[in-house]
């Protein structure tokens, strides 16, 4: 037996009720039966013409890094951005976000901490004035659709096979690090490329 959501194959996590076998390893995300795929949303993919405005210009090194990120993503490669805290990693990915949206791709930005989700949402909304940027985290789950989705790692379970580009920040931090369930949910949320941001790889 294998859970198609979290990848679990350990027998001790499978239980049987009147509806059949189901996985309890990822039960916090809702009941899913053995052999059952997570619900897939009908996703509208339409080009969104947008531009972003920064509060300060990027340095030549930052511009070069932003261009290289776009280049690798255009070649369908996953990217790791390793830079110190405060180095402007969020600003470095804005060009990639813009170009993805213009092509009609769905973009998600996942991070471990709720407070940072709210902070990133505000920064992205300030930069991309014409986008509907939404935060999906504890206390903010009524609206789950927008032009750009910023969410905690846990909330990725809502987005099975949705994102063409998934930006993942703080992948080295709790609770994502070492959590096999969250890793599988993140894998299933993205049908394209992943862009990892970290200060401590």
Question: What are the residue ranges of the model-derived segments?
Answer:
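N-terminal pre-P-loop "Q-motif" helix
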Residues: 54-77
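Walker A/P-loop
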Residues: 74-96
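Short glycine-/polar-rich loops that comprise or flank the Walker A/P-loop
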Residues: 104, 131, 190-193
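Conserved RecA-like ASCE P-loop NTPase motor core of nucleic-acid helicases/translocases
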Residues: 105-113
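Residues immediately C-terminal
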Residues: 113-116, 142, 172-174
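Inter-Walker segment of RecA-like/P-loop motor cores
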Residues: 123-160
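SF2 helicase catalytic motif II
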Residues: 153-197
């Amino acid at each position: 037996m294998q859970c198609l959501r979290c990848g679990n194959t350990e027998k001790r996590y499978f239980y049987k009720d009147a509806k059949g076998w189901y996985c309890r390893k990822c039960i916090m995300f809702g009941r899913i039966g053995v052999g059952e795929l997570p619900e897939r949303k009908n996703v509208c993919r339409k080009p969104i013409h947008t531009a972003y405005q920064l509060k300060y210009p990027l340095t030549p090194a930052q511009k070069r890094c932003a261009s290289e990120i776009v280049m690798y993503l255009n070649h369908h490669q996953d990217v790791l951005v390793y830079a110190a805290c405060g180095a402007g990693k969020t600003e470095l990915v804005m060009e990639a976000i813009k170009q993805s949206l213009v092509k009609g791709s769905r973009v998600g930005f996942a991070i471990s901490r709720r407070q940072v989700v709210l902070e990133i949402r505000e920064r992205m909304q300030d930069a991309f004035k014409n986008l509907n940027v939404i935060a999906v985290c504890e206390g903010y789950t009524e609206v789950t659709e927008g032009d750009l989705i910023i969410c905690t790692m846990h909330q990725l379970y809502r987005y099975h096979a949705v994102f063409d580009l998934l930006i993942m920040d703080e992948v080295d931090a709790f609770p994502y690090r070492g959590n096999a369930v969250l890793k599988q949910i993140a894998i299933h949320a993205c049908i394209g490329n992943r862009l990892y941001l970290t200060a401590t790889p």
